[in-house]
A protein has these predicted regions:
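A short acidic, Gly/Pro-enriched loop at the edge of an enzyme's catalytic core
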Residues: 89-97
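Mobile active-site "lid"/loop adjacent to the S-adenosyl-L-methionine
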Residues: 101-124, 146
Length: 305
């Protein structure tokens, strides 16, 4: 499927990619099978700290120019120049999925997921969760719509399959220097559950900020995880706008320092275990994977139903 926007992963700054990768190391990740499903030229691969560099890298990029550049830059990685919907990776294969998923108000044709009617960014999250193993981590940038939209369907879907270990809301200027655009986006850290469960934690639903703006309950309860304040965007949509953006007008604001501080609030522990290679991998080196353990999170409090 064609994208409405061009190569979001290309425009992810190396600094943001490094912050996300460093979070995985902070959690204890020390290498395994890593997928970037919308990789652009591979800024996440190029920003891996030393402990992650022993990983086996897999990438997907629909744009042929960016994909060919990535193949040249990361010649030991398994990179496919195609849409994520065309890939056939087995479920439960990857230890970590990282990246910046494409944002857009359009859908991808994939027979396995068509019944959910997901927008492209939510589709990427759903498929990534299937392909990461139980206990694995999906650490991706997505539009704020995933957490803030009024319809909770995607959040209910994700919550049944993963714990939201943590999230950080970026200000709308986070991609301005690299992409020339202002967009409010979130970094999500999702740990896949051992099995699907019927659960409805607070973050499936919306709350309000101190100034009465609708926002995901996670951010209403943890405003320190927003790198700015939520406002109505009246510049584009007029005085009656209900479209919200995350804004930080502090002239001394250092996004990367603040982002690292926010990520430091997220607690998770990862311990090594040895993956049993299947027949297709018997001739290859077996790379130790990492299994994520977290203590029961207060963010998974269930609502009475």
């Amino acid at each position: 499927a064609a994208r409405a926007t061009v190569n979001n992963a290309f425009y992810t700054s190396p600094e943001i990619a490094m912050c996300i990768n460093s979070a995985l190391v902070q959690f204890g990740f020390r290498g395994g099978n890593v997928l970037e499903p919308s990789m652009g030229i591979g800024n996440f691969f190029g920003s891996m700290p030393a402990p992650m560099q022993r990983s086996k890298l897999y990438g997907v990029e629909i744009d042929s120019i960016s994909g060919r550049i990535a193949k040249q830059l990361y010649q030991n990685a398994n990179i496919s120049i195609t849409g994520f919907e065309n890939t056939t990776y087995p479920d439960n294969f990857f230890d970590v999925v990282v990246g910046n998923v494409p944002f857009g108000d359009y859908k991808v044709f994939d027979p396995k997921y068509n019944k959910y009617n997901f927008r492209i960014h939510d589709y990427f999250l759903a498929k990534a969760l299937d392909q990461v193993r139980p206990g694995g981590m999906v650490a991706v940038i997505t539009t704020k719509g995933t957490l803030d939209k009024a319809n909770p369907t995607i959040r209910k879907y994700l919550a049944e399959r993963a714990e939201l270990v943590g999230a950080v809301r970026l200000p709308n200027t986070a991609f301005k220097d690299n992409a020339g655009t202002e967009v409010t986006a979130d970094i999500l850290f999702l740990q896949k559950r051992e099995r699907k469960i019927d659960i409805e934690p607070d973050w499936v639903h919306l709350g309000v900020t101190e100034n009465g703006i609708a926002v995901n309950s996670y951010f209403a309860e943890h405003p320190e995880m927003m790198l700015g304040s939520m406002e109505y965007d009246t510049r584009i949509y007029g005085q009656d706008s209900r479209y919200t953006v995350c804004v930080n007008n502090d002239e001394n604001f250092n996004m990367y320092e603040t982002l690292n501080k926010a990520i430091g609030n997220i607690k998770a522990q990862m311990t090594d275990f040895e993956r049993v290679a299947d027949e297709a991998e018997q001739t290859e080196e077996v790379i130790p994977a990492c299994l994520l353990y977290t203590s029961p999170s207060p963010r998974d409090r269930t609502r009475s139903r």
